[in-house]
Amino acid sequence: MNPIIKQWDTAKSLKRCQYKEALAIYETLCPKVETELSDTFDRAMFFGDYFGLLADVAQYDKAEAMAAKALKYITENGYTTLNYIFYNYGNMYLHQAKWEEAIPWLEKALNRNSDGWINEKRKAYYGTALGGALFHLGRIDEAEEELLKAVEAGKATVANKDWEPFFYLKEIYKQKGEEKLMAKYEKMYLTRLKKLKEEDLIYPLSEHRANKQALEDWKKLSNL
């Protein structure tokens, strides 16, 4: 196995709370990728992964530079199965509360791949992100539609453990005055939240209002 691939796999295998160790690996590998990694598909994936992690820790200028490299390889080679890189781009804007800028990238991530298929787990995560952006823009009906689709897509996957779509749905139904639906989704939200560890809610930023509220709610559930 190419040693770059091996170290990259190590970075990807680290837990979310180990992001500093992961960043150190990516920083070491970055200068070598374009000279020692011959497969341009792998290069696109590497820079896509790297900029996603950089965005998570608010290194936005550096993230933009790595994103440009990933998109260059995607465009030049016509790759159509790397939707997660578009999601990472949209997520970078979400971290900065740039909801309008995030939406086109999240919509692009949700487009089906060239073979007409997209992973249901990813569909759930991408749809939740899109629904959250729409919610923050006050586009409540559109947000509701995307979030319900995300919940449905994630039912049979690990995404069903995610608290975020249920948080937004209970907020939506609270705004709409639909108490029964609000109570339903609040219960689903809290059920998932209490199963988490604190590190799951503070990695590596908690800039979204949803994340901050979830952390507060988690502390109440945990009697902290």
Predicted regions and their residues:
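"A position-specific structural signal for the A-helix of alpha-solenoid helical repeats
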Residues: 8-9, 42, 49, 81, ...
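Flexible helix-coil transition and linker loops at the boundaries of alpha-helical arrays
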Residues: 30-43, 72-80, 111-120, 154-159, ...
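Residue at a conserved register position within TPR or TPR-like alpha-solenoid repeats
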Residues: 13-14, 47, 54, 93, ...
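Structural signature of alpha-solenoid helical repeat junctions
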Residues: 2, 41-42, 81, 120-122, ...
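Structural motif corresponding to the intra-repeat A-B loop/turn of tetratricopeptide repeats
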Residues: 16, 57, 96, 137, ...
